[in-house]
Structures are given as C-alpha cells and as structure tokens.
Amino acid sequence: MIVFAKRVPHGSIYAENCIPYTHANNVITQLVDSLGLKLCLILEDLGINTVPIPSDDPSHYWDVDKQYARGILSLRHAGYFAGLGVLGKNTLLINEKYGNMIQIGAILVDIQLENDPISNYEGCLEKCSLCIDSCPQKALNKTTVDQKLCRELSNFITERGFNLKKCHLCRTICPNCLGI
C-alpha cells in the first residue's frame, strides 16, 4: 500500500464563515483522489496492479441510524502505519510538520514495498484534553468519535443542498493543529 497526504490550507479554519474551510477541504479531497488516480495510472503503465482508495466519499459502510460511515480501510490508521503521523485524542492523524491539517490518500499495489518507520513523537500531551473538553457535542472520548453526535453539528446542508463543514473545533483547538 502507498499512503500519502496533502496539506489543507490552514488559513481556512480561522475564517469566521465556514465556507472557506468547506471549500478548501473539498478541493484538497478531490486533489488527493486525483493524485491517487494519476499514481495508479503511472504504476499500471509499469506493470503494477493498483486499486485507488477514495479519501472520503463514497463510504464502504453506512449506518443510517447511527450516522456512522466507514471507508474501505481506515486512512488514519494507514497513515499511522505508513509513518505519516500519530493518532490524536481528536481521532485525527497528527503530522509532525503539518499537524492535523492534512487529507490522506492511499492506493493498494500488488508489489512488496519497504516499510517506512512508524512515527514515534508525542501527538498529544498526556494531560491535554482540549479537544475532548471543547467539543460542543461531547462526541470525543480519547479513542473514538461518536459520528452521529459529531455530524449533527459539523455537517450542515444549506437550503440549496450544499454540505458545509460548520464545526471543526476538535481540529482547530488542538495545540498541534499546525504541526508539532
């Protein structure tokens, strides 16, 4: 598996309006998916079989009642095992240089690759619980997120049908939001 990440422009999270962050996040997600597909084509031209993994939607599994989505594989965990970062209490992957402001992508390949070392830095201070304590929905519990509670506030659909990312406090309040 090849796992990679792109940085999300951090200025977008500090805008008073949620549209800049939603826009930046959507464009970066499309860019990550596009990069994955381009890499697949390059590798296939070299005779290597590939499978692109979507960096967001569509979900492999969706529970309507719990508002719980799961992808084909956990890109956060893939990023951790690829050495791209460590998992924070906010459940996001925290990269040493870019913090949690990254979008992760991956492709599966049918060749043996050399492993990168797993990151061994501290992503969250032991006593820090800013993200957990500040979550207006109380959706975080240090190891997972209650997606239903989170989605009730974070995903907002406008009258015109646009999906806006209204809450990202767990990302922005993190002292390591922009790097360690």
Where are the predicted features?
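Catalytic cores of enzyme domains
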Residues: Y21-T22, V27-I180
